[in-house]
Amino acid sequence: MAHFQQTMNNKVIEAGMGRNSLINDLAQRRVYDNAVEELNHRSRRPRVNFSKVISQEQIIQATNAYPEFEITFYNTQLAVHSMAGGLRALELEYLMMQIPFGSITYDIGGNFSAHLYKGRDYVHCCMPNLDIRDVARHINQQDTVSTYLARLERSKRGLPVFQQSAFNKYMNDPDAVCCDKRFQDCSYSAGLPGKTYAVGLHSIYDIPADEFGAALLRKDVHICYAAFHFSENLLLETTSAPLDEIGATFYKSGDRLSFFFQNESTLNYEHSYKNVIKYVCKTFFPASNRFVYHKEFMCTRVNTWFCKFTKVDTYFLFRGVYTRGEDSEQFYTAMDEAWEYKKTLAMLNSERTIFRDRAAVNFWFPKVKDMVIVPLFDGSVTSGKMKRSEVMVNKDFVYTVLNHIRTYQDKALTYKNVLSFVESIRSRVIINGVTARSEWDVDKSVLQALSMTFLLQTKLAEAKDQVVLKKFQKFDDTVTNLFWKQISDAVGDLFPSIKERLISGGFVKVAEQSLQIKTPDEYITPADKLVMEYQATEELQHLDISKPLERAEKYYNALSELSVLKECDEFDITQFKNLCEEKDIAPDVVAKVIVPIMKNELTLPFKNPTPEALSDALSPLPKDLDMRFCLLKLSTCAPFPSVKTLDSGLLPKQSYGDERQFESQSVVSVSDFHLKSVESVKMKSMSSAVYTGPLKVQQMKNYMDYLSASISATVSNLCKVLKDVYGADPESAEKSGVYDVVKGKWLLKPKDKCHAWGVAELNNGEKVIVLLEWADGFPICGDWRRVAVSSDSPIYSDMGKLQTLLSCLKDGEPVLRMPKVTLVDGVPGCGKTKEILETVNFDEDLILVPGKEACKMIIKRANKSGHVRATRDNVRTVDSFLMHLKPKTYNKLFIDEGLMLHTGCVNFLVALSHCREAMVFGDAEQIPFINRVANFPYPKHFRYTCLYHREVRRLSLRCPADVTHFMNSKYDGKVLCTNDVIRSVDAEVVRGKGVFNPKSKPLKGKIITFTQSDKAELKERGYEEVSTFGEINTVHEIQGETFEDVSVVRLTPTPLELISKSSPHVLVALTRHTKSFKYYSVVLDPLVKVWSDLSKVSDFILDMYKVDAGILXQLQVGSIFKGENLFVPCPKSGYISDMQTYYDTLVPGNSTILNEYDAVTMNLRENNLNVKDCTIDFSKSVSVPRQQQEFFTPAHRTAAERPRSAGLLENLVAMIKRNFNSPDLTGILDIEDTAELVVNKFWDAYIIDELSGGNVTPMTSDAFHRWMAKQEKSTIGQLADFDFVDLPAIDQYKHMIKAQPKQKLGLSPQDEYAALQTIVYHSKQINAIFGPLFSELTRQLLERIDSSKFLFYTRKTPEQIEAFFSDLDSTVPMEVLELDISKYDKSQNEFHCAVEYLIWEKLGLNGFLEEVWKQGHRKTSLKDYTAGIKTCLWYQRKSGDVTTFIGNTVIIAACLASMIPMDKVIKAAFCGDDSILYIPKGLDLPDIQSGANLMWNFEAKLYRKRYGYFCGRYIIHHDRGAIVYYDPLKLISKLGCKHIKSLDHLEEFRISLCDVSSSLNNCAYFGQLNDAIAEVHKTAVNGSFAFCSIVKYLSDKNLFRTLFNNGSSTKG
């Protein structure tokens, strides 16, 4: 062991010293990969062309300044100030990059032609002509557009597609593109929804800073991005400030600031110096008494400063959540309007806070770091006046000079000596023959003035020192005389002038016998200078507040009068003030009118003018209105102020009793359903009905129809089960069950027992509904023949609810009551249940909840103190309340999770409870009511509850801070939390569902899944047994519950609509925990992206709960050419290593798999398999020894496996994968009616109108001869030997496996043992009978298909596919949809068979043969003679059936036709379980995921792409047509196959690959092919080098043989 450890240490040392070549190679490869990845990332940046001629240094400078762009320097245009002109385009693109693409944008002083070229039709340019230069510039912009159009016309080309919208807008409405008004005066308004933005490129100088905020607010600008030139030297008392990087200069003269380019003769730009300083120094710009625009610097690049102005609502100050209209103190807001002015004054005085931070100043003014401002003095010989200026000098330089010259003797302290020293330390010196550059770079032009300043400061400092020293001595003369004597000795003849200047300048003050010397400041910091400038330019005037106070007094008097109203705290003060100002009416007059209206003293027909109230007011009067007036006894002490508030003809009671009067005298019981004919229950149509009455009544009618549709679908399916069941099968346990009353046994045994009702078949064949009673697991039956039950009939809840609602109708109409309904819309964990328990009075109120568990939880929490308050009478489930009404009225009704209910159900609950007030608690962003009856119409406007009032709760008591941050993107208003946990969300992407095991992969806390299939699989793996919470639930099942720790698991690799960032299921899953949340997923999905985003948010942001997201959009450029595919021969180059590199890049790690002995390991190790009911002959478990087949060894490494041998374990694993554990996602579905509807849609969508009618008999002599011509003699011989006495067993199938495993193009082969594909097939006799039949039916179907629009990929060549897609118009905006379905064959159930049979019926399938075929595909038995396995399957698609391929194709086409408007589809193709659709861009589509789940039982994934992928081929559509490329990755994977037996076999393999990949010989569209591959494989790189290598090896027979090593055992 010691020797082994020493060897390991030596190898590590060798690797560190570079002597290990293997490690060095790996390091070099890592560097190469990083470089390639970085270059690829850089190539994806937006491209900008820089045509101006600039120097190499300027090129480097521009490239470093704008790393966001891919800049191409052409150097083809000579121009004045080339650098600044070229940078202007970069600056504009940088500003526009900050704005979400398509958002309304105002370009202040912009160049409209630049936006036209980019196709930005959403930008409006304000281009005022403030001087002559502006007029000339605008004319030049128009000329450039004309030149561009002329160049296109000369080359006979049209405008690119992305520019057409902008140019059309300029042609039709040029004022919408640009105007000649100032931004402050611009009258243009886009009138479109969404946020508004603005940009200002070197243009905000000309807008007064005091008007800037108001101008932005007038346009409702959300954020304004601006760029302007500035120099730190402008802060000094200097006249010029150069901008060397762009060759420009600022010149200051008083308040006039000029800007001009050096070496250029043109007009100067002139601005106000004070205005520019305000933009630099102010931190916010007031826009109104509420809104301000806060300025933030973004960056400085090449003498250009970038900043943004963000609109800020000051009402958010010191408040976490902004609320309106619910605070009673708002009545006094009008009195305090004067405080708004004081607040504005206070905010203005605090604007300089950023400049008190020295670090902040140095950051935004990088050139002032370690600099000081030194005064300079310049005198005039002629006038005798002196002028003062300032300069910025290095602080170290100043102190070096001052410290040195203070050491001079008095005689040596002269101006010449000081100047000599300053010049010496500034200039270059030679040391030992080497020139050394000075440490300080001070301008030589100011050295003389600086020397004079230094001399003067030193003289005054020495005089001050002498005075201090002589204070300790006694002198005969005064201090003043001593001081002047000292100065006179120092300056000599200049003494009179110096004395006068020192006194007048304030440096020396003389008062009687006292002397005060003030030494000048050696310097001031730029921060102090900046504050001084700001104070000098921002003087505030006193405000006249007499008028606001007078106006506030009027509003106060009016609001005092309104305060007598009930619930006056909900009065909207803002709307009241707007009404008074718009109508110019005195507030007290309006108040005197509002009070009688709100007290209902004017007998108006409604209280509030809502659409619902108007509908009630305009609806017909009740028929019994006269009778109600007769029954009514009026009195002055009546509790109700007006007649209209009475709900019925009975006077209300003053207390809450136990009686309630129903409108209908006859209450129908559920028992009336017993022995009722099924025809009276089944709905004839599910089409949309037209409802009448107010919206609430329409919702209630729709809910009753929903219950009827649910019962109808269940009854219809039970009738179908009775019709389909013939023989007995007591062993299987399915969803449905059929009991034979005569025989007293189950023909079809159900999983569950004790169903509440079912459908019975009488002796005369009539079918009726029966209510069941049970004894010893068997139903107690009458004089019936058979009884059918299903999993949809365990209880009669829908029946009970429907009968209760029918009993409460008045003249066939629901009785509508109008209590106050309040929606409490709260975020997860806001304490909705807690609020209910704290508010409810259990003696007179009622609580209703959707489920039993929630009901138990509320009762438990209410009674936890020991005092029993909550019972089964005042806390009930919704179903219990509707099924068992009790004669009692309630004061308040509380509905928990009310938004999960049908809105009509909520209205019924409110009406039947006779409550005075209803509180509906829910969350509008969580899972809503789900319509589980396929094809039942539930209109969108029915989904909104009619409310009297809405309250919001935005404080979560449950969720941690990171989850609260996520919720802020979902809810209006700010969401807060009280949880101390900051970070709780974590995620882990596992390599496959095979890693989940309770021992090796324990899950913490509550285990949750998104789908029922994942839930079932985790149960089978044993997680429910070890979980601390016991049961595993789906997200939908645990909405409203709370847990400390949560583990969410996703085992389904296919994309799910449930898991998207906008899905309510994701929100529910993320908000169930209080401490920790961990997400385990087998794929990268949006929830993993949410975790990734949350992990990047800083703790500071989490405290603010703010979401900031941007939208990036890439401009697409189309072409205008049409014609045939351009052909460019592909070069035959490259090596096998190129294909290997490409394969490893797209599927990293697959080539390193050692799977040669996986099958052996599988047979030797202990395996746990989830097997359904089957019979296994274990004598087959030991395979017969056989001689091992030798195969060629590929030189190319892939994840391909060798062929496997059939055996018990191998075949069983394949059967489990392909046939067992089928999904069960279907909702309530009326199979026969829905199948008929789907087939009608299929016929309307795909069949040509002229061929849509009339059935053609397929079994004709012509059809038989066509079939015979294509058959082998052996097949005909089988028919000749068949006796035709009886048909073979049509429901018996044989089972076998394919020896070669299917290669997967993902990473799953690294973690999973791939199951083999199975073949389930009939006997040859059955195929000989039904083969020609369905072949003829298929031919007739394909002849009727509209082949110009739809492609059914049967008997088609790759060239025909290419021809089908060649007429796609690339100029039409469109997108590609791909619906891919996992577990496609075994997901097909009874509904799919019904759809397929109806299609064959329309084509003329014989009735007897159809019935035989049905029975052969209902309940079937599988026998695998090789492995000794026998099992039973219900429905499912059989892989070796005569209808497998065409049946799968028809089903996928029917599925899409039932969900997508096929008349809007441009092109569509179907093949087996693959499909592709080309649809117009922006087409509104339904929820395809929900439809595929509930109706079709499919686990579907919907892809939206630019390029199509169909049957292993990429469809590249371009401006000349389309070309179809075989998937290169699949092709390379096949080159690593391990099943080649001989050279002849190898040559056949090469020829087959050449046939499918012939299009790769054309390399003209390899660029688009790379883009298409990148959509599928995120790690893809440009693979043109690999494609060339493929062509090279496939085209050469001898070269292709080098890809495989036949070894010594291979025989030709």
Curated annotation (Swiss-Prot):
Keywords: ATP-binding, Helicase, Host-virus interaction, Hydrolase, Inhibition of host innate immune response by virus, Nucleotide-binding, Nucleotidyltransferase, RNA suppression of termination, RNA-directed RNA polymerase, Suppressor of RNA silencing, Transferase, Viral immunoevasion, Viral RNA replication. Residues 72-280 form the Alphavirus-like MT domain. Residues 50-452 are annotated as: Methyltransferase. Residues 822-1080 are annotated as: Helicase. GO terms for biological process: DNA-templated transcription; mRNA modification; RNA processing; symbiont-mediated suppression of host innate immune response; viral RNA genome replication. Pfam families: RdRP_2, ToMV_Hel_N, Viral_helicase1, Vmethyltransf. Heterodimer of a large and a small subunit. This is Replicase large subunit. The lineage of its organism: Viruses, Riboviria, Orthornavirae, Kitrinoviricota, Alsuviricetes.
